[in-house]
From Swiss-Prot:
InterPro entries: MFS (IPR011701), MFS_dom (IPR020846), MFS_Efflux_Transporters (IPR050189), MFS_trans_sf (IPR036259), Sugar_effux_transptr_put (IPR023495). This is Probable sugar efflux transporter. Involved in the efflux of sugars. The physiological role may be the reduction of the intracellular concentration of toxic sugars or sugar metabolites. The chain crosses the membrane at residues 15-35, 50-70, 81-101, 103-123, 136-156, 168-188, 209-229, 246-266, 273-293, 301-321, 333-353, 364-384. The gene is sotB. Signal peptide: none annotated. SUPFAM superfamilies: MFS general substrate transporter.
Length: 399
């Protein structure tokens, strides 16, 4: 009995450590969102040019997820994770010392390489290490780590950057990763790869119209969100004329509202995923259209951020449920593809946002983001009527 409780405790500790790792990996992807103005200032560049760093990072992750998954498919998982963390930490140290913008971009590419492999193996590892009968909870812990990065990671990164300089944000993430690595080394057993590394399931997945439709929806809606979200910090300061501190508060509110979205989805997501996703996309569309009108009043912006945060969290979780429901037989490859496609959207949104800021005006980012959001809303209503699939159809309850 004692051994069993100890092993359950250790199993949960392993999963929690992975969730913390997920938090750290996601925090670093989005940390620059809150630091664009500061980084631009120190290199004498425009924020829109610095924003290209987000696009490069996201597209490296998107391009490398599948190739790296195949290259590392035979590697023992514990050793692979340790190697990833060493690359991740070393790249953050380079970010800290970056003596030019080019060096900063190179350091970010190193981090993106580690990120691409990490996300292609994490869900499968969480499932393997979960206590018996607790796979769903283990996956939801990883999702929580990811979600919390949006909630607290970005604002905390921004606060550190405001008070100690943006370089300290990257150093702090590197130190957090070092502590997590120490825990992983202590807790993880040897984990031989169980993944065949075969791409045989790819053509099968792409022959599933429901899944392909969800992938298309993902890239369009994520592009819409990141067109505006990537530049929210300079928008608040230059267009709304509010302080840097207010930008931090707004990022905290937007992220914190994600918790409400997560709770709502937890209660209703399995049975009503389709309806919830469509409502959330409609809400995102409204927020993007109202971004500029709301910018003349700080309270209006705060209220808008709450709805925006709820919407984007429901969309992110909903897309994952749809992918898992459409590919219960190939979750590894399907989720790796999902991560890649999500990152294509992040990169595209950041790119569109930077071009709008450079060639139109930063004030227009909400309106331009609303165009793909409207397309996503129409597409979601079409595909969910055609394929009303939910996770429950594939995963009967096990008591």
């Amino acid at each position: 009995m004692t051994t069993n409780t100890v092993s359950r405790k250790v199993a949960w500790l392993r999963v929690v450590t992975l969730a913390i790792a997920a938090f750290i990996f996601n925090t670093t992807e989005f940390a620059p969102v809150g630091l664009l103005s500061d980084i631009a200032g120190s290199f004498g560049m425009e924020t829109a040019q610095v924003g290209m760093m987000l696009t490069i990072y996201a597209w490296v992750v998107a391009l490398m997820s599948l190739p790296f998954m195949l290259l590392t498919s035979k590697m023992e998982r514990r050793r692979l994770l340790i190697g990833l963390f060493i690359l991740f930490i070393a790249s953050h140290v380079l970010s800290f010392f970056a003596w030019s913008f080019d060096v900063l971009v190179i350091s970010r590419i190193g981090i993106a390489f580690a990120h691409a492999v990490f996300w292609s193996i994490t869900s499968a590892l969480a499932i393997r290490m979960a206590p018996p009968g607790k796979r769903a909870q283990a996956l939801s812990l990883i999702a929580t780590g990811t979600a919390l990065a949006m909630v607290f990671g970005i604002p905390i990164g921004r606060i550190i950057g405001q008070y100690f300089g943006w370089r300290m944000t990257f150093l702090a993430i590197g130190l957090g990763a070092l502590a997590t690595l120490a825990c992983l080394v202590k807790l993880l057993p040897t984990l031989p790869s169980e993944h065949s590394g075969s791409l045989k399931s790819l053509p099968v997945l792409f022959r599933r119209p429901a899944l392909v439709s969800v992938y298309i929806l993902t890239v369009v809606v994520v592009t819409a969100h990141y067109t505006a979200y990537s530049y929210i910090e300079p928008f608040v300061q230059t267009v709304a004329g509010l302080s840097g501190n207010f930008a931090t508060v707004l990022l905290l509110i937007l992220g914190g509202a994600g918790i409400i979205g997560s709770i709502l989805f937890g209660k209703l997501g399995n049975q009503h995923a389709s309806g919830l996703i469509s409502i959330a996309i409609g809400l995102l569309l409204a927020c993007l259209l109202l971004l500029l009108p709301a910018s003349d009043n700080a309270h209006h912006l705060m209220l808008l951020s709450i709805f925006w945060g709820v919407a984007i969290m429901i969309i992110g979780l909903g897309m994952q449920v749809k992918v898992l429901a459409s590919a219960p037989d190939a979750t590894d490859v399907a989720m790796s593809l999902f991560s890649g496609i999500f990152n294509i959207g992040i990169g595209a949104g950041a790119l569109v946002g930077s071009q709008v800021s450079l060639h139109l005006s930063m004030a227009s980012i909400g309106y331009i983001g609303a165009i793909p959001a409207l397309a996503a809303l129409v597409w979601s209503l079409m595909i969910f009527r055609r394929w009303p699939v939910s996770l429950e159809d594939h995963q009967p309850h096990h008591s």
